[in-house]
Every structure is written in structure tokens, then in C-alpha cells.
Amino acid sequence: MRDVLAREGVDAPLWYEVPKSKKAPKKVKQAVADGADLLFLWGGDGMVQRCIDAVATTSTTIAIVPAGTANLLAKNLGIPEDIERAVHIGLHGSRRMLDVGVMNGERFAVMAGAGLDALMIRDMGDGLKGRAGKLGYVWAGAKNLAEQRFTMKVRVDGRRWFSGKASCVLVGNVGTVLGGLSLFPQALPDDGKLEIGVVTARGLLDWARTLGRSVMSRPERSPFVHVSSGRTFDIRLDRKRPYELDGGDRTSKKRFRVSIEPAAVAICVGGDAS
């Protein structure tokens, strides 16, 4: 990374390394306070989420250098995993203002969810992600398919939208989310709204049908998927369930308040800067 930056003429960048993504916000906030106008993030979706949470609504631009298992935000924005190309985009590409979602006071850029998806991510852990990669998601999903559904009530922009048994609820800011599936094909990260999907599938057969539709980018045609969009969501569960933000595990809750911050963060993307 240092060598690539040096070849681009950046010889002495301010440099921070952190052992875990949760340690990054403190360093990021210090860099922003010191006047950094461009911040390179070399890491996975968890690192990117933590840093966006710290940088959003400031004037600092983020350049993503993907180095995780899924790299979902980078994939949705067309940012390559090749370090040299990603750095070039950061220095010479255009800037795109993205919306961010906010769940229970914490920002996310790709997705947030509670239920089966969060159980999968919890069981994956950093160790399995590193060893098994995407196959780890398959293992974690199969392990949790027998998990009992829970009662959920959802309001979208203040209106009653869903009430019933569900396996998970997902909120998306982009189209391709968990496991690289296109669950929200209509989603755009700069359209001023979020997508929400409730999955009612239970058991292997139901999930096979649901995932089959998702692979074909037609999840809304599944009888086990309910999809809507809006600016605010109020999600209430009958008991505490684990939840996740951009693939990062969070402590179990039973109520989730979700909103959107439009055009909250600038991200470097492909194309020459104007």
C-alpha cells in the first residue's frame, strides 16, 4: 500500500494501523479533526462501516481499498480489489455522495439486519471468515436454518406494513447484500431511501426457493419475501435477537429504529474527477 501510494506521488501519508475495526473510529476522528480531506480505508466492510460512521456529514472524502471477505460496498460501487487500481481511483477518480442508513444510532452503508443473517455473521466470526471465506457463510446459514421464527411488527414511514412470524429482517442501502445476493435489485445508494425486506421462510425447502429467486435477482417474486422502501422504519420483535451492521455482529435487541441520512458521505469511485 505504501509503495503504491509512493508511485502515485504520495510519499509521506499520515498512517494508522488498528488490530480491529472497532479501534478505527478514534483514529479517523483525529485525522478529520487534523484537517484530512482524503481518507484511504484498507480493509473489509466492517472497517468501512466503522469509519463511515465517524466520517459521515464531515467534508472528508473516503477512498476504499478493499481487503475483506465480501467487500460489498466496494463491489456495489465498482471499486476493484486490485490495490493499484483502487488507489488510483482514490487519487484521481470522481466523488459520489452516498446516503447512509442509521440503525439505533449507528450508521451503515450496505445493510443492517436482525435474525438469521445476524446469527450467520455471529457464527462466522473473524477466524472462520479468514479461513473459509464465502464458504463460511454457507456453513453458518445451514447451521441456523432450524432457528425458530419470531413475531415481528414493522412500520414504514409511520404506516403499518408487516405483522407476523419471520426468520429475519434486512434493510439495504444497495442492491447486493449478504453473501453477494441481489436482494434489493432496485436499490441505489444515493436515492434518498432505504429498502426493507422481511423473510418468512422456514426450513430448507422454503429457503432454497427464496435463495433461488434471489440468485435470479427476483426476490420479490418469492412468497416468503416481503419488500418495501422508505425513509424510516420502526421494527419491533417479540424477543431480543442479534443484529448486524454491514456484516458486523452487534448485541441483541428487540426494537430497531432505522432512518436515512441523504448524501452524508463522499466516496471515491471510478471515472475521472471533473
What do the PLM-derived regions correspond to, one by one?
Residues 24, 46-51, 70-72:
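Short glycine/serine/threonine-rich phosphate/pyrophosphate-binding segments
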Residues 113, 117, 170-185, 249:
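Glycine-rich phosphate/pyrophosphate-binding beta-alpha loops
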Residues 156-158, 188, 198-274:
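ATP/nucleoside-binding phosphotransfer catalytic cores, i.e., glycine-rich phosphate-binding loops
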Residues 7-8, 18, 56-61, 65-168:
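Catalytic core of DAGKc-family lipid kinases
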Residues 185-191:
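Active-site loop ensemble at the mouth of alpha/beta enzyme cores that anchors a bound cofactor
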Residues 1-39, 49, 267, 274:
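ATP/NTP phosphate-donor binding region
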Residues 41-45:
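N-terminal glycine-rich "phosphate-gripper" loop used for MgATP/nucleotide binding
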